[in-house]
Amino acid sequence: ESSKYLLSLVNNILEMNKLEAEEYTDKEISFNLADVLNQVNTDRQILAEKKNVSYIVDWENSDLTYVNLSGNPVYLERLLAAVSDNAVKFTNPGGCVKVWCKQKKADNEHVLCEFGCADNGIGMSEEFIGHAFEMFSQENQTSRTQYEGSGLGLSIAKKIVGYLGGKIELESRKGVGTTVIMTVPF
């Protein structure tokens, strides 16, 4: 368990350093949104199964009006993985994580995608929510040890959302769960 935690911590630190060092270029490439979502969700479903957490994907490929998009699929995948990994990590066995994607036309050239992730995990206190996106922030030592958290997941997500020109919102209640909504233009 300790080696898994250390590996996760090192990977998160490397990810954050990489994001800090990279000069984000907004070179857009064409990509298939369904492929990105399926990859992220397949990997998370495996993690959730190992932990006995239900992982519900609340969309079908047919629900996606705009599948072929232009943007940065690598950063999108990193964003969705960071948020859904956190949800699985902080949800106790027997709990549930639900992810979704909704789309709407922003204008003649852009599509707004709303990616959501909700869990019935441990949640956060009202006082802590303001610090949730800070690097290495954790509500208490129990989070760090019991859930093997590094306090980087949401700070990584916020950094990537900024690169993608989107916004991220967080709602949480201690003992009830957390919902993260990311709106990204493509």
Question: Which ranges hold each PLM region?
Answer:
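A conserved beta-strand-to-alpha-helix junction within the catalytic ATP-binding
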Residues: K27-Q45, S54, E77
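Short helix-loop "hinge" at the ATP-lid/N-box region of the Bergerat-fold HATPase_c
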Residues: A87-V88
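Short alpha-helical Gxxx[C/S/T] motif in the catalytic ATP-binding
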Residues: E148, G153, A157
